[in-house]
Design a protein with these regions (language model features):
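Conserved beta-strand positions
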Residues: 47-49, 78, 170, 212, ...
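Aromatic- and carboxylate-lined catalytic core of secreted/periplasmic carbohydrate-active enzymes
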Residues: 25, 30, 320-404, 408, ...
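Noncatalytic carbohydrate-binding groove/subsite architecture in carbohydrate-active enzymes
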Residues: 186-318
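Alpha-helical scaffolding within the catalytic cores
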Residues: 29-32, 57-66, 96-103, 153-155, ...
Length: 432
């Protein structure tokens, strides 16, 4: 996925050939990675590295990004193929972890809690040619059933390559598992793949935590047949059906993974940009109920319609209130899809750091929520006299967000405050 672009998740099963030559890497030992920091609480918040990140930035930028990410240890997620990583197994049994080694080394050096997403798959597992990579279709094609065992074997090889990684998500957004003949998700095919990967990972290390199904959950503003709806829209029942099939037929799981956007497919954010976020809480509650309170992970979330024209202040305010919704609904992990761009691009909307390494507003938001609202911290009810000022609090700290495009004065937690348009303000409470 890419920032603000939430479409085209239903890949095809087409045959494909060609693409660039994918060479096996030189034989080299696995990197020696520092273990993740020991923390009292699971951080809950984190980032997914995408095509461009700090590991392939100029050294000064990389060092600044390392400091931004590491000041409060975050979850840091990386895919095994695509999104900054080359083909990990260009031909059967021939591996190339060059980019993946570099990315995982950066995560370790920036005190990240490492997470790996097991997607995508080498071409030869999907009907393509061994030794070549067709990147144009990489993200849209699933492994063929006869290669499910090969993909599970690759997953196990990667788990052995990075023994400090204890959390794995299986596949991404059901890519390639849309069945156009039945007009629904092929949950049966995905779950068969998932179960093979689950078994393979657990054989490597029983402490490895495995999650799926990583289904994209879309909504429409128009009503339709669905067991889950609200003022924010109607959930596509086919996504819920796929999730329930996986819950019933999985071999096992340590957490359940989904992703989604506040935007409906037919009308953008409804009823408005801030109220639309209630979708995330409603889906999280549904998941916890259906999966017997299994930890819920949001692998991606999106809140901004294309061509929104939002200022960075509004963008960050909407993200802040979204994170409030995640915390209130009991989400265990929420991974921000970091939209870093190639060096030299001056404007990087929603990025964690700028092209020159300077931190962007999203960085402080992630650090603040990770420090004050990790898993296990008890939330406290705090009143705001003006509904436009949203607040999330624990015993020692609260965060306020002005959702209006004008100054708002309100009494929050017994104190009068004036917030500028879309301002986010942290305030100590001196308790606990």
């Amino acid at each position: 996925m890419g920032i603000m672009v939430y479409a085209g998740t239903r890949g095809s099963r087409d045959e494909f050939k060609g693409g660039e030559v994918a060479k096996a890497g030189p034989s080299q030992p696995a990197p020696t990675l520092a273990p993740p920091p020991k923390l009292d609480n699971w951080p809950r918040w984190g980032v997914t590295h995408t095509q461009y990140s700090a590991d392939n930035a100029p050294r000064p930028v990389a060092e600044q990004a390392k400091g931004i990410l590491g000041r409060v240890p975050l979850l840091q997620n990386q895919h095994i193929m695509g999104w900054g990583a080359g083909n990990p197994e260009p031909s059967p049994g021939q591996y190339n972890f060059t980019e993946l080694n570099r990315r995982m080394s950066f995560i370790a050096s920036s005190r990240g809690m490492p997470v790996i997403t097991l997607c995508c798959a080498p071409d030869w597992m999907k009907g393509g040619q061994a030794g070549r990579t067709d990147w144009s279709k990489n993200h849209t094609v699933a492994p063929k059933r006869e290669h499910f065992d090969d993909f599970a074997k690759l997953a196990a090889r990667i788990a052995r390559q990075y023994p400090t990684v204890k959390h794995f998500m299986v596949w991404n957004e059901f890519k390639g598992f849309w069945d156009p003949t039945t007009n629904r998700w092929d949950a049966e095919g995905y779950t068969e793949l998932y179960n093979k990967v689950y078994d393979a990972l657990k054989r490597v290390d029983g402490d490895i935590q495995v999650g799926g199904p990583y289904v994209p959950i879309e909504t429409t503003a128009a009503p339709g047949p669905s067991e889950l709806s609200g003022p924010w829209g109607t959930v596509d029942q086919r996504a819920l059906d796929a999730i329930e099939y996986w819950i019933e037929h999985k071999k096992g799981a340590d957490f359940i993974v989904v992703d989604g956007a506040t935007m409906t497919t037919d009308k953008g954010n409804v009823p408005d940009d801030f109220a639309a976020q209630a979708k995330f809480g409603a889906i999280t509650s549904w998941l916890r109920k259906k999966a017997n309170d299994m930890p819920v992970w949001w692998a991606e979330w999106y809140v901004e319609p294309q061509n929104s024209g939002w200022s960075e202040e509004k963008r960050t305010a909407v993200q802040a209130t979204t994170m409030m919704e995640f915390a209130r609904s009991g989400v265990t992990s929420a991974l921000y899809w970091n939209p870093q761009q190639k060096g030299g691009v001056k404007e990087c909307h929603g990025c964690v750091w700028a092209a020159d390494g300077q931190e962007m507003p999203m960085a402080g938001l992630l650090s603040g929520f990770t420090r004050w609202f990790p898993v296990g911290v008890a939330l406290e009810q705090v009143q705001s006299s003006d509904a436009r000022v949203k607040v999330l609090a624990q015993a020692q700290q609260l965060v306020m967000v002005n959702t209006a495009d004008r100054d708002v004065t309100a009494t929050v937690d017994g104190r009068q405050v004036t917030l500028k348009p879309y301002e986010i303000k942290w305030s100590g409470r001196g308790q606990g």
